[in-house]
Swiss-Prot record:
A Pfam family that the UniProt record links to this protein: V1R
Function, as annotated: Putative pheromone receptor.
Gene3D superfamilies: Rhodopsin 7-helix transmembrane proteins
Protein name, as recorded: Vomeronasal type-1 receptor 3
Family annotation (CDD domains): 7tm_V1R_pheromone
GO biological process, one term: sensory perception of chemical stimulus
Topological domains, Extracellular: 1-5, 72-91, 151-186, 259-263
Keyword list, A-Z: Cell membrane, G-protein coupled receptor, Glycoprotein, Membrane, Pheromone response, Receptor, Transducer, Transmembrane, Transmembrane helix
Entries under SUPFAM superfamilies matching the protein: Family A G protein-coupled receptor-like
Regions of this protein lying in the Cytoplasmic compartment: 27-50, 113-129, 208-235, 285-310
Amino acid sequence: MASKDFAIGMILSQIMVGFLGNFFLLYHYSFLHFTRGMLQSTDLTLKHLTIANSLVILSKGIPQTMAAFGLKDSLSDIGCKFVFYVHRVGRAVCTGNACLLSVFQVITISSSEFRWAELKLHAHKYIRSFILVLCWILNTLVNITVPLHVTGKWNSINSTKTNDYGYCSGGSRSRIPHSLHIVLLSSLDVLCLGLMTLASGSMVFILHRLKQQVQHIHGTNLSPRSSPESRVTQSILVLVSTLCYFTRSPPSLHMSLFPNPSWWPLNASALITACFPTVSPFVLMSRHPRIPRLGSACCGRNPQFPKLVR
């Protein structure tokens, strides 16, 4: 009983911390939008990332907490379909935005070379349309079949194989459409993870080469303090590594392989699924020694927000 109470407390704490962290960043970028008139392309990407993070945390954490308290039949059939759909779309948008951040940062730190200059200009110009079309509209359409494979606990589908998610059930009378849907989602995940891996390797290579060039020009007596571009790139590398780790963690794989997991793997999977949306805003803010105070903006003073990513 004490262990279950501890798990419930962990889920509730994660919901509160993750939601507040993402709300703070969303407020930050909304403040910049209304005071400066327009956000930079990367700022808009991070704004969409905070929205997607909040959707993942709320759509996964709240129903899982209710199920942990024993309220497994609290969601109706429509409620289960809606919660699962929002969660899948939010998680896909998180992955897409992380991919955008890594690719865009490669373009940014490589812009000193002539062949990247024109690409950077086009990236700044078309990044808004790319986010809206690819990360939201595309993922909304791709996941449109998710509600067809989810039902409430009290209205389970008569199928030979039903997945138990604690607060909802998943299954289908026909396995062929569901299999095609899984293949499509997996293909998109593999594509995004592949791009992030390639971009991360490129960032490491470019930073190493720039460091060697600086050492060659100024000698080895350099300050240990890294440049702003290096700190931003390191933050994005941590974000990408966190996303790749938690999306392929053992509890998440356990949920995919076993249709009816026990209580602990079920809640462990919920905790790990929401780890990236919870951690990512603090990773972005941690590179600044002084985080801007929310109260100063609420009181009408200019808090001098630093730019998280250039």
